[in-house]
Amino acid sequence: EYHKNILLEAIGEYPLITISRKSVNLGTNIVDTEPQSHFNMYRQILRASKLVTTPFVATAESDTLYPKEHFNFYRPPVDAVSYDMSRWSLYTWNPVFSLKRRISNCTLIASREYLIDALEERYGENSKCPPERVGEVGRHIHEKALGITLRNAIEVWCDVPTIQVNHENGTNYREAHHPKRKRLGEIKATEI
């Protein structure tokens, strides 16, 4: 409930499309019945992006706290995606916060058409990309490995950071056997 209220306050009047395992009365709701995985997560982002009626898409995750500034401070050009790098990570198994220079879908803002085109190429019905090879749009190491279009990605920094809560129930934890691979970022803190 707390996360929901923070998100609703942050997005203000922007329309909301939610993707959930069970039906929820929150914006336009898509019920996801597919097995939980990173591949499916991207397919659901594609599915939701096609329903968007605004020129830009901003993804939000239920385990991330967003300030209203995040959704208002920047829009990328129509031929690029952007990632807000001012994201502090909190790990439920570690008392230290960290900031790392790595793009994350939880802070993605992109032109709707550009994002749909990129996701269709990777995860659409005619995609030949293997389900075990996934990565953010604009992350060239994955795009090169998949032999797909290299997408433009811009790293931006909001004055007010987001806070991402990494926990044992998250897809990252289960799929990558974290916390062993979930390392702290370059900048560390014991309180924010």
Region roles according to the model:
Residues 54-67:
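Short beta-strand-to-loop acidic/aromatic patch adjacent to the donor-nucleotide binding site
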Residues 1-10:
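Short, well-formed alpha-helical segments that are part of the catalytic scaffolds
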Residues 71-191:
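Conserved catalytic core of nucleotide-sugar-dependent glycosyltransferases
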Residues 26, 67, 90:
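Conserved protein kinase catalytic core
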Residues 2-3, 27-32, 72-75, 96-98:
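Short, glycine/charged-enriched secondary-structure capping and boundary segments
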Residues 12-22, 56-58, 81-83:
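Short, hydrophobic beta-strand segments that form beta-sheet elements in well-ordered domains
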Residues 17-55, 70-72:
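Active-site-proximal specificity loops/subdomain of glycosyltransferases
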Residues 38-45, 62-64, 130-137:
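Conserved glycosyltransferase catalytic-site signature
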